[in-house]
């Protein structure tokens, strides 16, 4: 399948040899609404800024750093009027392997994810996000229709991703160092922050409040609730 996909690209694009240097810059999908950098995630206030349209963006530097931004809508077959919204951001380092694959290694404490389910919850789930990624193949070309540089990625299972187009070179990114060192957890201290949703992304206006939560806490919370016989416990 992946071979046929890239053979098709040969017919519609002007192909150039792809190497690590070709990746440098900021790439975004056709809507151009989602772009990495401070217009998507504000690390000072720890909030997302909602784009006008869904999409994704990747940035790569010459010295091996990356940043990614996603804004997606997930269909709800049982209630079509209630799609979920997901915003994701992370950054870290990348390497291009000898077989042409790309491996992304995020800074674990910095990644963020915001999930909105407007018809089942009054709150948006705001959590840390840390997901290593592998792209089995990439090509950089000049798109024959748009006449701009185009990046095609094949995911870990060889499925082609949406093409992205170069919008900035050098890339538009946040600092490549750790942005949230206070988020590091120890056995004695865990961070649980409640933030004013008025300053956060609404994901289509569906979210009224949000929390930065360590996902592991939900397991222990559930065990504790069961042990207490279902007594409601509220704490900050």
From Swiss-Prot:
Places the protein is found: Endoplasmic reticulum membrane
Single GO term (MF): unfolded protein binding
Residues bearing attached sugar chains per UniProt: 52, 130
Membrane topology: Single-pass type I membrane protein
Positions in the Lumenal compartment: 21-214
UniProt keyword terms in alphabetical order: Endoplasmic reticulum, Glycoprotein, Membrane, Signal, Transmembrane, Transmembrane helix
Listed InterPro entries: Rot1
GO biological process: 'de novo' protein folding
Cellular component aspect of the GO annotation: endoplasmic reticulum membrane
One Pfam family, short name: Rot1
Entry's transmembrane regions: 215-235
Protein origin, superkingdom: Eukaryota
Claim: Transmembrane is one of the keywords in the record: yes
Ranges facing Cytoplasmic side: 236
Signal peptide range: 1-20
Coiled coil stretches, renumbered: none
Function: Required for normal levels of the cell wall 1,6-beta-glucan. Involved in a protein folding machinery chaperoning proteins acting in various physiological processes including cell wall synthesis and lysis of autophagic bodies.
Similarity-based family: Belongs to the ROT1 family.
Protein name per its UniProtKB record: Protein rot1
Organism the protein comes from: Aspergillus clavatus (strain ATCC 1007 / CBS 513.65 / DSM 816 / NCTC 3887 / NRRL 1 / QM 1276 / 107)
